């Protein structure tokens, strides 16, 4: 133990040579939003994950990433049409629930091949998911019904071979190419100009923090928004584009602390935090 402590004490912190960095990552680095945030938050963690490609052993089951994919699928397919609206343009709850159930069944059939061969645990899990997914869809529908913005694109890709080119930045002589997807793009035409907002569904607990943006993290939605302003004219009917903002929407049915006297408005405000 003493020998190991002496060895550790004699070690010095160094850095990789430029030749080693080029050999490891190349001179053109393709970055996703999560990779960019990982690099800004901890260089060593980035090196271990994306340089050494070390991975933790994953447990079998329907984990958070799979749940996020499932919810994104439901939201995308529900809001590709306007059939959930009532005659006044508001939310028809019965139509919305029926459409949500239909999309969930489609996901189970097309993405999972049905549940007949799955474990009883997974079948039970999907039965339990229906109620919270309905609540998530209802929350998104009510936000849309109160807005002049309408969905005009879903899962919009940035990168080679996708809907729009990647976001490219030059850093220390290297070209960083950022690729990824925007969950939803909403548009509103006013005075002949197209106002765009990008929508990010939050299935986890991560929230938007302006301090992160100041420190170079959590920039992806803003980068995508300004890339849409620059590159999206031909994609959206030739309108001149104005960036209207970034909207982070909770895509989970959170359990909140409350009381019997809590109003519906107060409950929704707590859920949206």
Where in the sequence are the language-model features?
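Structural signature of nuclease core domains in nucleic-acid processing machines
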Residues: 1-273
């Amino acid at each position: 133990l003493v020998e190991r402590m002496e060895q550790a004490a004699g070690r010095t912190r160094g850095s990789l040579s430029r030749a080693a960095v080029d050999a490891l990552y190349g001179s053109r680095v393709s970055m996703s939003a999560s990779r960019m945030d990982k690099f800004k938050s901890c260089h060593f963690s980035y090196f271990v994950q994306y340089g050494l490609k070390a991975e933790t052993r994953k447990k079998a089951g329907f984990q958070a990433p799979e749940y996020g994919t499932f919810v994104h699928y439901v939201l995308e397919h529900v809001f590709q049409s306007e059939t959930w609206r009532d005659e006044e343009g508001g939310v028809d709850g019965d139509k919305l629930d029926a459409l949500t159930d239909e999309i969930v069944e489609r996901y189970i059939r097309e993405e999972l091949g049905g549940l007949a061969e799955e474990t009883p645990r997974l079948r039970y899990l999907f039965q339990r998911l229906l109620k919270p997914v309905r609540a998530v869809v209802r929350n998104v529908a009510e936000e849309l019904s109160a807005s002049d913005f309408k969905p005009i694109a879903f899962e919009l890709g940035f990168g080679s071979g996708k809907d729009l080119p990647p976001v490219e930045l030059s850093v220390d002589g290297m070209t960083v190419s950022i690729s990824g997807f925007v969950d939803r793009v909403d548009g509103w035409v006013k005075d002949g100009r197209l106002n765009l907002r990008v929508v990010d569904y939050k299935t986890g607990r991560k929230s938007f923090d302006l301090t992160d943006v100041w420190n170079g993290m959590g920039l992806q939605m803003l980068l995508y928004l300004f890339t849409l302003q620059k590159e999206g004219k031909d994609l959206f009917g030739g309108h001149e584009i104005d960036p209207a903002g970034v909207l982070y929407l909770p895509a989970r049915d959170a359990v909140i602390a409350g009381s019997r006297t809590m109003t519906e408005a107060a409950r929704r405000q707590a859920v949206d935090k």
